[in-house]
Every structure is written in structure tokens, then in C-alpha cells.
Amino acid sequence: GGPYSYGL
């Protein structure tokens, strides 16, 4: 969900 790969 953001600029990196989190669980978002």
C-alpha cells in the first residue's frame, strides 16, 4: 500500500 512491500 506504500512505497515498500508491507502488509498494507
Swiss-Prot record:
Keywords (A to Z) from UniProt: Amidation, Neuropeptide, Secreted
Modified residues (Leucine amide): L8
Record flagged with keyword Secreted: yes
Signal peptide: none
UniProt superkingdom: Eukaryota
Gene Ontology, cellular component aspect: extracellular region
Official protein name in the record: Carcinustatin-16
Organism: Carcinus maenas (Common shore crab)
Keyword flag Secreted: yes
Compartment annotation: Secreted
Similarity comment text for this entry: Belongs to the allatostatin family.
Main location: secreted
Role summary: May act as a neurotransmitter or neuromodulator.
Biological process, per Gene Ontology: neuropeptide signaling pathway
